[in-house]
């Protein structure tokens, strides 16, 4: 569930809160109180040891028993105060570690603005019409003729394809005649589920692969921001 919380909300809560100064002050005061109680218990124990031999009678024994019970309470109280101080100290350390891991709100805003700017500018160039041919156009291999009713005319017009050059294009035309007739290009492959000559779909071009890498990088950045981990 914490991954669904916006990064800005967590960052604002951490950086705009009261910080750990009050917890640190409480830890110091509790440690001082624990030391004071422990010192009082030690002093009372020393006094009881000195008076134990001189006290006689039932009243003295009753007072000594009450003093021993009070001494036991002071010792337990001192240990409890010290444990509380240690718990507060661990909370302070956890807060400081979390503060180091959480990205500041200003940095998150700048990163998101940078991502929007990169998406809008489209540094990969995939959306610039000047760098792309219209859909359905085919760039044929120079010096090669294609019949109007041949395999190239049956390709899906939505898939912009490029005719792949074939090694040895100047070879004997009879060597390129098979059971299916003359083939302007060697081999067959599938383009959007339709058979055709050996053509390279636009999905295999370096420009498309660069676009895919760019969008993958953007998704990784957004995931990193959601995880709220500051790079060290």
UniProtKB/Swiss-Prot annotation:
One of its GO terms (cellular component) is plasma membrane. Residues 123-147, 169-200 are annotated as: Disordered. One of its GO terms (biological process) is response to host immune response. It holds the Pfam family PPE. Belongs to the mycobacterial PPE family. PANTHER family: GLUTAMINE-RICH PROTEIN 2. This is Uncharacterized PPE family protein PPE58. It comes from Mycobacterium tuberculosis (strain ATCC 25618 / H37Rv). The lineage of its organism: Bacteria, Bacillati, Actinomycetota, Actinomycetes, Mycobacteriales.
